[in-house]
Design a protein with these regions (language model features):
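Domain-level signal for soluble alpha/beta catalytic cores
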Residues: 1-72, 77-106, 110-118, 122-141
Length: 141
């Protein structure tokens, strides 16, 4: 309920789109406050954001990234029990020729940079600000 009040404060208006990010909370995880903050801040930083919501299956992430021609897939998990879904998304995305150049960014309380490397994600973000910084840096390359 409070996020709609934060949106205008966190978004920098009038920015040309720098890329497209498909974002969501993985299957089995209904916690989306962090994901929502990342989405708002990415929009404010000039990215087009396709927010899939929460409890999103690996196939839904991949299908959306293909449909939207996204440059990034962003995933969030708050529960350790849902972290393996991130690995499933990475594996499925890597098998899709259309997603060869897509960068995958993960974050959430139990997630670490080590886990990101272990599952083959391209980027790890420890909070919303670092998510924006890392996506922005990757988009500029």
């Amino acid at each position: 309920a409070g996020l709609e009040h934060l949106t205008p404060l966190l978004a920098e208006g009038g920015v040309v789109a720098k890329g497209k990010v498909v974002i969501g909370t993985v299957s089995g995880d209904l916690h989306d406050i962090g994901k929502n903050l990342v989405a708002i801040m990415l929009k404010g930083a000039g990215f087009e954001v396709v927010d899939l919501g929460k409890d999103i299956s690996p196939q839904a992430f991949v299908d959306a990234a293909v449909k939207e021609k996204a440059g990034f897939i962003g995933m969030s998990a708050l529960l350790t029990t849902t972290m393996p879904v991130m690995k499933d998304v990475v594996a499925l995305a890597r098998k899709n020729e259309l997603l060869r150049k897509v960068k995958i960014v993960i974050g959430g309380a139990p997630v670490s940079e080590e886990y990101a490397r272990e599952i083959g994600a391209d980027l790890y973000a420890f909070d919303a600000a670092s998510a924006v910084d890392r996506v922005r840096a990757a988009a500029d390359r």
